[in-house]
């Protein structure tokens, strides 16, 4: 069984709005904005997406130079079953729109002492065997011990942070196993401090450091929960998108439009409009005002709350 098929979002949320005749505004044609627009449009809502840039996909972009394609942001896809689920529920199978293939081997590491480590895709046993071959039995045993911790982190964080919306702080701390879960995630520990405690081989430590550095973070301060990334890659595999990762954004934008969503490019949103604490629409950079009782912001939280919403307090979930 393909391990990626084991992934299935547990939460299928239906947007709560007054009427489906109301127009929904989505800020940003990144992957999250496009996914929201697709599901909303498929459910019968009128959807308009405003994207500041000239193309869809957000950080998932590909440029072509002299016949070669280069990904300018992420280059690998993990958990493709998330997209399979989205495409299946909004029309055609993902495979009918895009070629997604496992990267094999997943990674090739070369170290200054001449050591080479080649890691397979979607194989926990194969990964341990490769580490043992290159670094020895002790390193392999330490890696497996670390991945057991990462597996627990993934089990704890997957549902509340990945598959569900994060409501209030109260809803988070009221979880039955909150204290045990906090100990597992160890938010007070950095990635490097946890890894250095579990791993003795400096090459393996360097390998794990890169899960912080490739996102522009410092492993000395990045949270230990980043260990879930190598775990997910090891278990669910690393995948290549035919034509480059930007192709994923293109086909998702097409899917959103096929479902009825309208997308306007080169059209930044300058402000989310509110009245009496309720959203009334958005103001575009060109001065246009688009009225809407429902706005989905795919911008990061700092931009959304720090600029687009002005000085309004952070939203609370109302039942």
Feature map (PLM): residue ranges:
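Extreme N-terminal leader/targeting segments of oxidoreductases
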Residues: 2-24, 42-43
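N-terminal glycine-rich phosphate/pyrophosphate-binding loop and immediately adjacent elements
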Residues: 19-158
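Rossmann-like flavin
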Residues: 112-222
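Residues forming anionic-ligand binding surfaces in small-molecule and nucleic-acid pockets
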Residues: 222-233
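Glycine-rich loop(s) and the adjacent beta-strand/alpha-helix scaffold that form part
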Residues: 242-251, 258, 272-273, 283-319
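A conserved short coil-to-beta-strand element within the FAD-binding core of flavoproteins
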Residues: 265-278
């Amino acid at each position: 069984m393909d391990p990626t098929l084991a992934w299935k979002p547990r939460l299928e949320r239906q947007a709560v709005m007054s009427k489906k005749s109301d127009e929904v505004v989505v800020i940003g044609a990144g992957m999250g904005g496009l996914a929201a627009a697709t599901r909303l449009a498929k459910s019968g809502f009128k959807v308009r997406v405003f994207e500041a840039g000239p193309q869809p996909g957000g950080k998932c972009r590909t440029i072509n130079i002299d016949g070669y394609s280069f990904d300018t942001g992420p280059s690998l896809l993990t958990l493709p079953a998330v997209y399979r689920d989205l495409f299946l529920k909004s029309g055609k199978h993902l495979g009918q729109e895009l070629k997604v293939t496992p990267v094999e081997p997943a990674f090739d590491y070369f170290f200054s002492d001449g050591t080479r480590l080649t890691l397979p895709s979607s194989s926990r046993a194969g990964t341990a065997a490769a580490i043992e071959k290159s670094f020895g039995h002790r390193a392999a045993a330490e890696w497996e011990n670390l991945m057991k911790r990462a597996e627990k982190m993934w089990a704890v964080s997957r549902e509340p942070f990945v598959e569900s919306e994060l409501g209030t702080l109260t809803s988070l701390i009221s979880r039955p196993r909150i204290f045990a879960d906090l100990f597992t995630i160890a938010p007070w520990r950095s990635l490097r401090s946890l890894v250095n405690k579990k791993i003795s081989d400096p090459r393996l430590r360097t390998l794990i450091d890169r899960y912080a550095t490739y996102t522009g973070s410092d492993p000395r301060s990045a949270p230990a929960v980043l260990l879930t990334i190598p775990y997910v890659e090891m278990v669910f595999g690393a995948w290549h998108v035919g034509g480059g990762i930007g192709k994923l954004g293109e086909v998702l934008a097409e899917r959103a439009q096929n479902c009825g969503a309208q997308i306007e490019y080169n059209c930044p949103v300058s402000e989310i409009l509110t009245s009496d604490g309720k959203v009334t629409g958005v103001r575009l950079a060109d001065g246009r005002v688009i009225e809407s009782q429902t706005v989905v912001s795919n911008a990061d939280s700092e931009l959304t709350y720090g600029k687009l919403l002005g000085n309004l307090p952070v939203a609370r979930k109302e039942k």
